[in-house]
Design a protein with these regions (language model features):
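ABC transporter nucleotide-binding domain
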Residues: 108-192
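Catalytic Walker B motif of ABC-type/P-loop ATPase nucleotide-binding domains
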Residues: 90-94, 99
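ABC-family P-loop ATPase nucleotide-binding domains
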Residues: 15, 19-78
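C-terminal coupling/interaction segments
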Residues: 180-225
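Conserved ABC transporter NBD signature motif
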Residues: 1-8, 12-13
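Helix N-cap at the start of a conserved alpha-helix in ABC-type nucleotide-binding domains
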Residues: 101-103
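Conserved catalytic motifs of ABC-family nucleotide-binding domains
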Residues: 86
Length: 225
């Protein structure tokens, strides 16, 4: 990470990393202005003016106790704190969980703005697949510490597909591009990373466009080829 082994990280290297967790991370009895001296003492490169500007932009009152903030406001505060010390890498763990549709959309806009600066990266752990589809360049599916799938998001959405076939169709199917299959009442569902190949060569079978949720279910519950 950041071009070096994490075991060799210096304090300065660690300050280039920001973290946003599902919890606010701050005591609810504190106000935003109360955490300013904390951030200043924790980070050598804390940019107070930038932090205050973000609080103003995100409409975070400085004199209000954090416990009175909405869930969306708490997430915005976390992001403001996480990026206000020159962070080049942002770790986010289920940070949009529990937010309503509007709050999640605002969060994604904030992250897109953060990524406009060259050299920055975001690592997002989330079970909300629509968020991943909208903002991530790459998708990793991890189960029990094992990477089951790594794919570019655009490729996953454009080239992956779900085939719905009867038993006899499945037997006659060229399985060269089938990643996994699952027994269904009607026959089989099959995950492919070459949807166009099957559309061109098997016009009689039902083929749906791939979605992250479909891929997750098939890679987890289906039988891999």
């Amino acid at each position: 990470m950041l071009g070096k082994n994490v075991e060799d990280f210096t304090v300065q290297d660690k300050e280039r990393i920001g973290v946003v967790l599902a919890d606010s991370g701050f005591s609810g009895y504190l106000r935003v202005k109360d955490i300013l001296p904390m951030l200043e003492s924790m980070y050598h490169k804390f940019q107070k003016e930038d932090f205050l500007e973000m609080c103003k932009k995100y409409q975070l009152p400085l004199d209000k106790k954090i416990k009175e903030f909405s869930m969306g406001m708490k997430r915005k505060l976390q992001i403001a704190a996480a990026v206000s010390h020159g962070a080049d890498v942002l770790f986010m763990d289920e940070s949009t969980a529990g937010l309503d549709v509007m709050a999640r959309d605002e969060m994604l806009d904030i992250l897109r703005e953060y990524m406009e600066t060259p050299g920055r990266s975001i690592l997002i752990s989330s079970h909300i697949s629509t968020d991943l589809e909208r903002i991530c360049d790459d998708i990793y599916m991890i189960d029990e510490g094992k990477i089951l799938l790594h794919e570019e998001t655009d490729k996953l959405l454009d080239q992956y597909g779900l085939l719905k076939v009867k038993a006899d169709q499945y037997e006659a199917l060229d399985k060269a591009y089938i990643l996994a299959h699952k027994k269904e009442e009607y026959g089989y569902s099959c995950l492919t990373n070459e949807r166009q190949y099957y559309q061109e060569n098997y016009p009689d079978i039902t083929i749906e466009k791939g979605k992250i949720d479909d891929v997750i279910i098939m890679m987890k519950r289906g039988q891999q080829e």
